[in-house]
Amino acid sequence: MQLSPQEKDKLLIFTAFLVAERRKNKGLKLNYPEAVAYISGLILEGAREGKLVAELMSEGQTWLTRDDVMAGVAEMVDEVQVEATFPDGTKLVTIHNPIQ
């Protein structure tokens, strides 16, 4: 299988997202890399589903709460940026203060 560097990055994000999602579903609090991977994965999936950048930026602030993450993680994640492929091209999605 031949993958471009961007495709490898997306595959790595998605793999980390699956680990984070599994841990969240078990009721475990996410650490910093897991929280970022979880949000990033949902951005990529939303883009694939055809959601708009504005929708993802708005929804992104509801995906995780302070109760979902370990102490101090919410303060460490002030924004998450991911290049996602939308039906009309690749766009940078930025979610400010994603953990409320």
From Swiss-Prot:
GO terms for molecular function: nickel cation binding; urease activity. Its main location: cytoplasm. Its EC number is 3.5.1.5. It catalyses: urea + 2 H2O + H(+) = hydrogencarbonate + 2 NH4(+). Keywords: Cytoplasm, Hydrolase. Pfam families: Urease_gamma. The keyword Hydrolase applies. Pathway: Nitrogen metabolism; urea degradation; CO(2) and NH(3) from urea (urease route): step 1/1. It is an enzyme of class 3 (hydrolase). GO terms for cellular component: cytoplasm. It is found in: Cytoplasm. InterPro entries: Urease_gamma, Urease_gamma/gamma-beta_su, Urease_gamma_sf, Urease_subunit. Signal peptide: none annotated. SUPFAM superfamilies: Urease, gamma-subunit. GO terms for biological process: urea catabolic process. This is Urease subunit gamma. The keyword Metal-binding does not apply. Belongs to the urease gamma subunit family. Heterotrimer of UreA (gamma), UreB (beta) and UreC (alpha) subunits. Three heterotrimers associate to form the active enzyme. It comes from Picosynechococcus sp. (strain ATCC 27264 / PCC 7002 / PR-6) (Agmenellum quadruplicatum).
